[in-house]
Amino acid sequence: MLRREEQEAREFKLLSAHATKAAESKGRARPEDADLYRTSFQRDRDRIVHSKAFRRLKHKTQVFIAPFGDHYRTRLTHTLEVAQVARTVARALALNEDLVEACALGHDLGHTPFGHLGERVLTEYLGRPFVHSEQSLRVVDVLEKDGEGLNLTWEVRDGIAHHSWSRPEPSTPEGGVVRYCDRIAYLCHDVDDALRAGIIDLYELPSFSRKRLGIGYSERIATFVNDLISTSAEAGEVRLSEEVARAMDELREFMFERVYLSDEVLASQRQAQHVVESLLEYFTKHPDEITGQHRVMSDPVEIQVADYVSGMTDRYAIELYKRLFVPKGFV
């Protein structure tokens, strides 16, 4: 039998001096009794996995809205891939795998329906940037468990809040691992999905990134992961080598030009934009129809509406739009 205290002691023996130890966590906003068998970061991981927001990720778009194939990524499969890649890196660097896993599993809980399109529409609606990493933190702090939140540790909250490259760097090396692995995962699997959709051809990929990262999906992932591990171990900080970082930037620029802003993706986004805008307008006029945990009564109406609509899955948003705006005989 392996109790929590023994696991915490093992962390001090086995993990790197740079690793974040569960026993040294800065704690939770609301203090809790320790668990018999799970460390604080393990409990956070479990709370995230059992949350409603986590389950909804399976019906939220990654890039392709309502694809016909069964093998395109969703926000949930993306999250799981980030967690797997990040744990591999953390294990090799002797960092805290439990902290990495919790941050990875929670990093996209605040994502809107229809991918980043929903984020842009909510930015226009609110008149200020709607940032999914900030909303992810709001989900775990406020919206889950009917307003109680998940009461996660400071370290997991920090990793969730700072996983995006537009935000300040995370305070822990584990958060830094998730930050890199999020980008690694989405670039590699978005290329894979774009090839499957026929939007790009394999040999259209930029020549330097193709040469440096490899041609196949597995080869690209392996190159990124191995480079992140070896470079970070040598540098004493989480980062890629200059050459692989250049290949990543080149591939990301290509994906924006040829995939994320392609006619095929933008065409479906225009339809989705109308759905989100219509729902925002409707619930602004009818806030009493907002249901469940998505409503904090003390907040302004526009915040209540943003919480509600941003928490919807693609499928639920479309069905709700039909119910509200499409005559029954036309459905």
PLM regions and their residue ranges:
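A generic, well-ordered mixed alpha/beta core segment in the N-terminal half of proteins
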Residues: 99, 103, 108-146
